[in-house]
From Swiss-Prot:
This enzyme's EC code(s): 3.4.23.36
Subcellular location: Cell membrane
Keywords: Aspartyl protease, Cell membrane, Hydrolase, Membrane, Protease, Transmembrane, Transmembrane helix
Chief location: membrane
Organism encoding this protein: Bifidobacterium adolescentis (strain ATCC 15703 / DSM 20083 / NCTC 11814 / E194a)
Organism placement in taxonomy: Bacteria, Bacillati, Actinomycetota, Actinomycetes, Bifidobacteriales
Protein name: Lipoprotein signal peptidase
Pathway recorded for this protein: Protein modification; lipoprotein biosynthesis (signal peptide cleavage)
Enzyme class: hydrolase
A GO biological-process term: proteolysis
Region Disordered, annotated ranges: 167-187
Length: 187
């Protein structure tokens, strides 16, 4: 039991450190964009691929949901709570890291929706990374990385819970008792 508590403590510490650092990076880059790009200028980083342009986005990714900012904010709050719960419940450090980045992305954009709100949770997200087909921010990158990592972890069969680990190892609840019976039958 002590080992489980230590692992939980370690996962919580990793989650907190990654989430705090990632949120800080997101917010610092947004502060920079608000000051450096406020005059409407565009900085070309990689011509044709990436430029820096300040946009205030009332919606979600790819401009969807611009009329439902309050709903997007409530969903982001629910997602943040769910990600913390998942991080505490998993036995996998890989899943913990994924949840920390997803939390940082959701919370980073939620901060904007609260800070820059003129009404109930209707603030606009600070976007400045212009890819030509979409404009986003560092929080969006964290969310995208978490999504890709989730697909990879699922594809690779990374166990989320002790039950998943036991199933991956071919164990079920009755396996310990059946192992002696099977061994006796085989002899």
């Amino acid at each position: 039991m002590k080992n489980d508590q230590r692992r939980l403590r370690d996962r919580v510490a990793v989650f907190a450190c990654i989430a705090i650092a990632a949120i800080a990076i997101d917010q610092l880059t947004k502060m920079w964009a608000l000051s450096a790009l406020a005059d409407g200028r565009t900085i070309r980083v990689i011509p044709g691929l990436l430029s820096l342009t300040l946009v205030r986005n009332p919606g979600a990714s790819l401009g969807m949901g611009s009329g439902m900012t309050w709903l997007i904010s409530l969903l982001a709050m629910a997602a943040c709570v769910a990600l913390v719960v998942l991080a505490v419940r998993t036995i996998s450090m890989k899943w913990t890291v994924l949840f920390a980045f997803a939390f940082a992305g959701a919370f980073g954009n939620l901060i904007d929706r609260v800070i820059y709100a003129e009404g109930f949770l209707n603030g606009k997200v600070v976007d400045f990374l212009n890819y030509g087909w979409s404009i986003g921010n560092v929080a969006d990158i964290f969310l995208m990385l978490a999504g890709v990592a989730a697909v990879l972890l699922l594809f690779l069969g990374e166990p989320f819970s002790q039950k998943d680990l036991d199933e991956a190892n071919g164990k079920t609840l009755g396996d310990d008792a059946n192992a002696t019976d099977d061994g006796a039958k085989a002899a």
